[in-house]
């Protein structure tokens, strides 16, 4: 049994629910057992609704489902942690929700970095711990496999309390879902079970299901889960990532190329996918805008080789226009984050979905062809881009 409820916010726990942050015991808290059954079918919320994050590139091109599961793919240093912290911040401000972050078999240094950065960006409020927005549960690489295998369940139990008892929207982060499978494989070997494909445990599907099926929307509230997925040797057909994909509703892929260009969040607009991007779910307007953005960016990608060697002058007039708009779109997909204010010096922006769609609807047909592309870089909505353009002209 582990402590649950408001008293867990701002604290760090191990797999047994013991605080490990040297801030003393958790005060008068309720406890829940970590082994619980998934909600019954009758309790599930079957309505498909979008979970607005306030991050333009995510909401427009690969929207998250309320109570869905999202896979987060990206190497080291492309902004996974910052994206996770921005989501924690936005769910607290826009949805009045809370977050639980489970560190499953990752480096202790990364857990420490996340803790320090959450304190720096005020996601964990050191002065008044009760105002914190996240509870952290860690079972890192140095722990025995049993702890790493169960820490995901500890985190989801804490999230379930906020959903079922407090009736709130909860974000559950799991970093890294692959390590959960890896720990299960180690335990399976220790128990002397016959391994299945690629040496994984024979119970791989059941184990993954027992964790994933608990992460869902009920009529009371929702748990939306964002899971970092490590792909061993970049092989997507490996049983561990392949089993994970079966449960995901959306994928957010972070690109090193975009990070190198200075476009943050470095979410790849063409590689990120979502089952929610259907006209009967998001509406025709959103769907058409998203497809238009993707087509423009895809054409720009195809023209890159020509631009790299003979140069822009060799392109047709139409293609040159496409390139100019694609570069505007690429920059408009960036935005300043609240949690990165400390580093960038520019205030964070939360952009609602209708504002996001409106902005891209103006760029696509060429209404803003007269704006310099720099004006749409690191701004919130399209009005700010116009204001920035005016400021650039006045200054220039």
UniProtKB/Swiss-Prot annotation:
Gene3D superfamilies: Bovine Mitochondrial F1-atpase, Atp Synthase Beta Chain, Chain D, domain 3, P-loop containing nucleotide triphosphate hydrolases. ATP binds at residues 74-81. The keyword Thylakoid applies. Pfam families: ATP-synt_ab, ATP-synt_VA_C. Its EC number is 7.1.2.2. Keywords: ATP synthesis, ATP-binding, CF(1), Chloroplast, Hydrogen ion transport, Ion transport, Membrane, Nucleotide-binding, Plastid, Thylakoid, Translocase, Transport. CDD domains: ATP-synt_F1_beta_C, F1-ATPase_beta_CD. It is an enzyme of class 7 (translocase). It comes from the Eukaryota. One of its GO terms (cellular component) is proton-transporting ATP synthase complex. It catalyses: ATP + H2O + 4 H(+)(in) = ADP + phosphate + 5 H(+)(out). One of its GO terms (biological process) is proton motive force-driven mitochondrial ATP synthesis. GO terms for molecular function: ATP binding; ATP hydrolysis activity; proton-transporting ATP synthase activity, rotational mechanism. It is a peripheral membrane protein. It is found in: Plastid, Chloroplast thylakoid membrane. Belongs to the ATPase alpha/beta chains family. Produces ATP from ADP in the presence of a proton gradient across the membrane. The catalytic sites are hosted primarily by the beta subunits. F-type ATPases have 2 components, CF(1) - the catalytic core - and CF(0) - the membrane proton channel. CF(1) has five subunits: alpha(3), beta(3), gamma(1), delta(1), epsilon(1). CF(0) has four main subunits: a(1), b(1), b'(1) and c(9-12). This is ATP synthase subunit beta, chloroplastic. The lineage of its organism: Eukaryota, Viridiplantae, Streptophyta, Embryophyta, Tracheophyta.
